[in-house]
């Protein structure tokens, strides 16, 4: 898929917010940028930011962000290859271990969206069962009512953690299916 920056389409009534935090794992720097081409809009935003006490980032954060953008290409290429391997690994594991589950294809993210509605549990039960088996996901309802029966899976981790997490999820789901088959709640 081709990325089209919004600022390449128009300079009017638009702004762009960006940060190196997700891409380069620099959230601790608490540094972001706002690109506002329209001078009048930029002036209004600057006035409100000053009123709110928002200042530019500290020198360490500015330099860390600059270094990531200027020198981080090789590291980022390696990360992207690793995450692509994790995505493929998760896809294969879900297909093999959780045949009733549906993994939404991941595009431009390291977060998988796993549909477990076929197992007949709501998010509260899913979370209780997965925690009992020592694995935690983000429950789908965190993102709204439409997320009921879904879990979010983070693949930005060592591959062995994905394997372990899916195996524990399988144990939790198998246990639930077994209990329901025997009339145990």
What does each model-found stretch correspond to?
Residues 1-185:
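PLP-dependent class I/II
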């Amino acid at each position: 898929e081709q990325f089209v920056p919004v600022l390449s389409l128009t300079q009017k009534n638009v702004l762009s917010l960006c940060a190196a935090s997700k891409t380069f794992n620099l959230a601790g720097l608490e540094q972001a940028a706002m690109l506002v081409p329209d001078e009048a809009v930029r002036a209004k935003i600057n006035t409100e930011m000053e009123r709110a006490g928002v200042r530019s980032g500290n020198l360490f954060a500015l330099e860390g962000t600059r270094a990531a953008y200027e020198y981080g290409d090789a590291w980022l290429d390696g990360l992207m290859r690793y995450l692509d391997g994790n995505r493929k690994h998760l896809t294969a594991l879900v297909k093999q271990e959780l045949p009733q589950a549906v993994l939404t294809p991941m595009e431009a993210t390291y977060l998988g969206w796993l549909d477990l509605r076929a197992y007949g549990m709501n998010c509260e039960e899913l979370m209780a069962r997965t925690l009992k088996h020592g694995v935690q996901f983000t429950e789908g309802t965190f993102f709204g009512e439409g997320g009921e029966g879904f879990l979010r899976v983070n693949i930005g981790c060592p591959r062995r953690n994905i394997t372990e997490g899916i195996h524990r999820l399988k144990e939790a789901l198998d246990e639930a299916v077994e209990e329901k088959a025997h009339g145990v709640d």
